[in-house]
Amino acid sequence: MAKSTPGAAAPIEATPQYWDEACRHLARRDRVMKKLIPKFGETRLASRGDAFTTLARSIVGQQISVKAAQSVWDRFAAAVGGRSTHLAPGRVAALKVERMRGAGLSARKCEYLLDLAGHFVGGRVHVAQWAGMDDEAIIEELVAIRGIGRWTAEMFLIFHLLRPDVLPLDDVGLLRGISHNYFSGEPVSRAEARELGEAWAPFRSVATWYIWRSLDPLPVEY
């Protein structure tokens, strides 16, 4: 058996095993989901399979467009070296700020990425234990890292750990999609979204993914 290293994530399945069950549940419980789910065929949520890279991409993408985020990410990954889908925390930690800024990162995002790398290199995140921890415990651990708030932690739960029942109420796209699909475009409060999401449990991550897809047919990835 190979030895684990600090920050090394356990293998994550590429797609959730619960997906088909979740789709059946949602179609039974929600008339909008019953119409939405068949529109997207066999496409489903997929994990990149690397914890550090997923979190780093979330930081890079904060407050900029998807297109701009991809451009900055590609330049940043090239500066780090290695595969852009599996960046090594140690290489990021050793990167000079000037090179990071040259990739298009703000000074603040450079600080965040270096702090993230430091947590992984120093073993201050308990990656090997995440599989046995509940969602809120993981969120608490992640938000201790600079630049990671609750929204970023929830995206990580959905896109990396493939947790089935996350409802990211701070996500603008989710609220916009609920407004479009359920309230004829009228503004939706977090409380209304939470109440609607009760019917989706225990598969609120899956419902959220389909709501996102209703706004943008391209699969969402982090």
Give the location of each predicted region:
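C-terminal accessory module of base-excision DNA glycosylases/AP lyases that mediates lesion recognition
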Residues: 1-43, 111, 131, 135-136, ...
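Alpha-helical ds-nucleic-acid-binding substructure associated with the helix-hairpin-helix region
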Residues: 13, 64-146, 201
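Generic secondary-structure boundary/loop-capping signal
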Residues: 23, 33, 42, 49-52, ...
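A generic short alpha-helical patch detector that favors 3-5-residue windows
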Residues: 28, 47-48, 84, 88, ...
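A positional/architectural concept
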Residues: 30-53, 57-58, 65-83
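A general alpha-helix detector
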Residues: 54-59, 75, 95-99, 137-141, ...
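Generic anion/oxyanion-binding catalytic loop in active/binding sites
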Residues: 58, 102, 127, 142, ...
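Conserved S/T- and glycine-rich ATP-binding loop of Class I adenylate-forming
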Residues: 60, 149
